[in-house]
Design a protein with these regions (language model features):
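Solvent-exposed alpha-helices and their adjacent loops that cap or buttress functional pockets
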Residues: 18-20, 43-44, 97-100, 121, ...
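C-terminal charged capping/lid subdomain of soluble metabolic enzymes
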Residues: 2-15, 303-427
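A glycine/threonine-rich phosphate-anchoring loop and its flanking beta-alpha core
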Residues: 122-221
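Short glycine/serine/threonine-rich phosphate/pyrophosphate-binding segments
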Residues: 59-61, 110-119, 137-140
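ATP/NTP phosphate-donor binding region
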Residues: 1-104
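Short beta-strand/turn micro-motifs composed of small residues
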Residues: 52-53, 109, 166
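Short Gly/Thr/Asp-enriched flexible loops that form oxyanion-binding sites at enzyme active sites
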Residues: 113-126, 271
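Active-site segments that bind and position negatively charged phosphate/pyrophosphate groups
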Residues: 214-356, 361-371
Length: 427
């Protein structure tokens, strides 16, 4: 990928922000596992490294360690997990303990493996590289990592990888569930960009059309390849990987996660926190996000069709009801995020004046639920609640109360100002 070209296009950006990112090299290609050592050496990546992987990711990356050794890298230090499915603070500390006397960390894998290395590298000020093994989520180029503390999902400040390497031979053979999860994470960008634009309209939140377009171009590329996602197809796997990387870079360029996520991510977080607090595996990130996206796309189109006129008022949230939906461990964070709450910044008269434009944006920039479901099914994505093991009760509470987990303007968060219930629009 030509990263400099991306930055050059954003020079003197009309949004007024100086756009930059820390990632220096992204190499996505067929059979480049054997060239990994050469790529890292050319990039100036330090030679004394810690390799972090699990048994599955190390197995599919045959030849990687040999390539590194041939290029003069010391790979004697390794942390190999049995099967890494979820990132925990204890694992971050394990990486930190072993990385203390090396100069760089190489994560071999995706998702949680990347996250624990991203945080540890940041906290120890070590160089960080990702050798990706599946196009499963959009966080490869992110400078934050998810964390759950007291059953509440927030983000760690972390480190963008200096180098990202992905061999399309490996990506194409990744488990279908992981490839489909990556597609599910990408379609969420429709709502991320929509709600970013709405926040700009209603409360003057910073918005950059050029950065948004980077995400939308990546999204369009992914959608054009929907029917190839589940195939052992290197071209589509590489293109989707590139789109996922661009989505992460867009977050760094914008200085926020708006280009990549909207209400659908927070709904997914609500479901995830509920399950983890009860010791239940919450499913892959992109799998949940895809289902939440489909639900909200249908709801938002119904809102735009049915609520042609609105009379917004000051926020009518029943706070006792909201607080009752969160556990004793979660409550302090919920209270903090809503003191003040985001709707304190919304002028009802301005919301009314903007409503026609909000409805237009929904209708013109977001595909219909029918079209989106068609794309997702072609890509092998989960589309139903039973696919992600979410009960009807958890579904409803997640949709009604997720927005209180963030200080962020979302369509779902302004529903109390409109005297409406999101559940009235899901069908």
């Amino acid at each position: 990928m030509n990263l400099q070209n991306t930055l050059d296009k954003l020079k003197n950006c009309p949004c007024g922000k100086v756009h930059t990112f820390d990632t220096e090299v992204v190499e996505i290609g067929s059979g480049i596992t054997a060239k990994t050592g050469e790529i890292l050496a050319a990039a100036g990546f330090p030679k004394k490294v810690l390799i972090v992987a699990d048994n599955n990711t190390l197995r599919v990356s045959a030849g990687l360690l040999e390539s590194l050794e041939a290029a003069g890298f010391d790979v004697s230090k390794k942390l190999i997990y049995n099967d890494m499915k979820y990132a925990k603070i204890e694992q971050v500390r394990e990486v930190e303990a072993l990385a203390a006397d090396v100069d760089g960390v190489i994560s071999v894998g995706t998702g949680s493996l990347n996250d624990i290395c991203r945080v540890a590298s940041f906290e120890l000020d070590k160089k960080f590289c990702i050798f990706a093994t599946a196009p499963s989520m959009d966080g490869f180029a992110s400078d934050t990592a998810p964390r759950i503390v007291n059953d509440f999902k927030t983000s760690w400040q972390a480190r963008q990888p200096m180098v990202i390497i992905a061999d399309t031979k490996i990506l194409a053979k990744a488990p279908i569930e992981l490839k489909s999860a990556g597609f599910g994470d990408m379609v969420a960008k429709y709502l991320g960009i929509l709600e970013w634009r709405i926040a700009n309209l209603v409360i003057d939140e910073y918005y950059c059309p050029a950065v948004a377009q980077i995400t939308l171009d990546a999204l369009e590329k992914c959608c054009s390849l929907a029917d190839k996602v589940t195939a052992d197809d290197e071209e589509s796997a590489g293109a989707i990987m590139e789109a996922l990387v661009l989505s992460g870079l867009a977050m760094k360029l914008a200085g926020c996660s708006r280009p990549a996520s909207g209400a659908e991510h927070v709904v997914s977080h609500y479901w995830e926190c509920y399950k983890l607090a009860r010791g239940i595996w919450p499913e892959f990130h992109g799998k949940k996000v895809g289902v939440a996206t489909l639900v909200l796309v249908r709801a938002y189109h119904n809102i735009a069709e049915r609520m042609t006129e609105v009379e917004p008022t000051a926020d009518k949230t029943n706070w006792d009801d909201v607080y009752a939906q969160f556990s004793e461990k979660q409550l302090p964070e919920v209270i903090k995020l809503n003191s003040p709450t985001i709707t304190d910044k919304i002028d009802p008269a301005r919301l009314k004046a903007c409503w026609g434009e909000i409805c237009r944006l929904i209708k013109e920039t977001v595909p219909t639920a029918e079209k989106l479901e068609e794309l997702m099914l072609a890509a092998g994505c989960a589309t139903k609640l039973e696919d992600i093991h979410v009960s009807d009760e958890l579904y409803a509470t997640g949709l009604r109360y997720h927005a209180y987990m963030r200080y962020r303007l979302l369509i779902t968060r302004i529903m109390p100002m409109l005297g409406a219930d999101i559940m009235d629009f899901v069908e």
